[in-house]
């Protein structure tokens, strides 16, 4: 093999001028204008959305229906405006009161399509993180409600029955049906119950930030409607097969007494009853006070009486509509008009079962008996909470732990009190105290189990001394408590995802990953953690090992700085029985890296010995070029190791696009891994990020090139030509035969070679990231000079075509699998939707 020449390490990318016809732009203008007229949108928001749409369309290739991208632009513009209200001086609501569901209807766009496209739009439009967080919250809230409605449908069918003269679950009838005025029909009963729940959960959003609490609230609403049906003696609406019915409910002299059916549908009955007596009653009292509902305030009956039912349904609808317009969320009433089972796309996109990480699969308990059933998020979350609640009776350290002495225990309780105050200050829910109490109970249980296991493993050690040593270890107690809090948050399916606990308690990921293995070992062996929770712990440990622990401010870099370089290899850390924290950390990193290399090589159908060679390249990057991991992701280095091996070996396949496709099939895969790779720190102190092509070409190859060549025994050939190590995201252009343009004429087109193209004496060159902006402006003026100028109105932004023509240089999709031998310093790569590109280069016109 020939040794690669450093001069031939460039990544070829073609930047082209994609001209957009005036007719096409005129059609877009007209379609956008008509869409805004249908929505009755204000002019300012309309212009703002259109400008954003044009700006993004100039930079990115927007595939699919244009109206769908317009929908994203309009929604973004609407959410970033405020509308004055008449409720008080200077009072405003966020948004311009354009309904999201109405917007989707006008754009002929499904909820599933919107949820997918709006996330891509956030990336393409470079929207602020605050807005991205709002979109994630919107997505998550709807996913929870979608799953709850599926349970709602099942429970309602168990309790109530549809009279023979009514159509059950007819589409749209619940929104537009005609029924006898004043009398509650089966479909309207379904409507009022679902709307009552929607209004109740929005009344106190902080109380329903998790799946389990929202489910309990929904059961409380169903319980209330059930009692009202019994009180009105609407036996025609009751399912006689329901097990929770009073024994004498069919008798003529039946008198209704408060009857609770929570135990029929809640595994955690006490928690649901506590909510019914406190939070739910407070919400209903506020509804009566605000005249949102009418009936007997004390007994909460009479909601379905002929004189109250219609106005209650109307009032709940108005209240919910006002809320939806003010927050810009999906109108979740539409779920009443559809069968959730028909929406396979939404089912796939809703709350999914936890993925199985590659590491520590042997610690997972056996699949439960119902494992063959379809994953049910509500049941899974309830089971998780129920399992942790079994330890809720433990309110203080066990007698075994107390043997450490009063002074040590007092210090331990002081640490826990300090942690609790931090949690209560940052957890956005009135349930914060009960959540932490559950975590604290589990902490006391785990602490007892861990210390007793230590005694069993070291029977000769002094008990008192061991207890004092362990219980007094501050970082051990803090990380163990944080791990218990994380388990409780995961069990309830709250919106606060890892690494929130690290920020809450100011813990480094390097310190936190130490405790996870201990918790998993004792939790799985004692049976206090089920399969789902252990999967979660394994997953967040991998997150620490792959990314968080390698952050610039991580304590691991202090240890690396004081260690003897190069860092120990896989063999060294496994032979060292007296390994320290750094060695144990590297042992976990090496194992994780090896498992992922094996998985990717298997997906790529590489030969059996290939993973070992790639492993040695990866190991060298950790031991000798450790800086490659600083502020970066393990998978970024693994993908680069695979590709540099392929390039040195001169293999035709797989391409880099194949590597990325295989990576996207991994359980831990996220797009940001190849879209946003840390490069350097800017002058203003902010991190500079580029795509993985730039990182591979300009950072990875210069550091790893010589080692890979030496390790794989690449030698120069006679001609002295070199292979190309570096990555080209542009497809390889193969020589093609002359192509016949049409069958009716003997007209052929053949490709010109590069040396046939005559250079223009008046050429203009613009180098991205290097040339000043005025050069690009001059180039654009040159291009626009020969174009006809059409005026369609006096309105700025939408009227003058000259101002909105997309004659600027447009980005071309960069596909990362071309092995052409071109210099990266002479070409440029640009990112588009769903792909990545390299650094800027030159463009001629």
UniProtKB/Swiss-Prot annotation:
Residue numbers bearing the Phosphothreonine modification: 356, 359
Modification comment: Phosphorylation by cyclin E-dependent kinases appears to negatively regulate RBF activity.
InterPro entries reported in the protein's UniProt record: Cyclin-like_dom, Cyclin-like_sf, RB_A, RB_B, RB_fam, RB_N
Pfam families (alphabetical): DUF3452 (PF11934), RB_A (PF01858), RB_B (PF01857)
Subcellular location: Nucleus
Cellular component per GO, a single term: DRM complex
Sites bearing Phosphoserine, chain numbering: 760, 771
Keywords carried by this UniProt record: Activator, Cell cycle, DNA-binding, Nucleus, Phosphoprotein, Repressor, Transcription, Transcription regulation
Keyword Hydrolase listed: no
Keyword match NADP: no
Any one GO molecular-function label of the UniProt entry: DNA-binding transcription factor binding
Function field: Functions in cell cycle regulation. Component of the DREAM complex, a multiprotein complex that can both act as a transcription activator or repressor depending on the context. In follicle cells, the complex plays a central role in the site-specific DNA replication at the chorion loci. During development, the complex represses transcription of developmentally controlled E2F target genes.
Subunit (UniProt): Forms a complex with the DRTF1/E2F transcription factor through binding to a C-terminal region of E2F. This binding inhibits the E2F-mediated transactivation activity. Component of the DREAM complex at least composed of Myb, Caf1-55, mip40, mip120, mip130, E2f2, Dp, Rbf, Rbf2, lin-52, HDAC1/Rpd3 and l(3)mbt.
Similarity comment: family membership: Belongs to the retinoblastoma protein (RB) family.
Record-given protein name: Retinoblastoma family protein
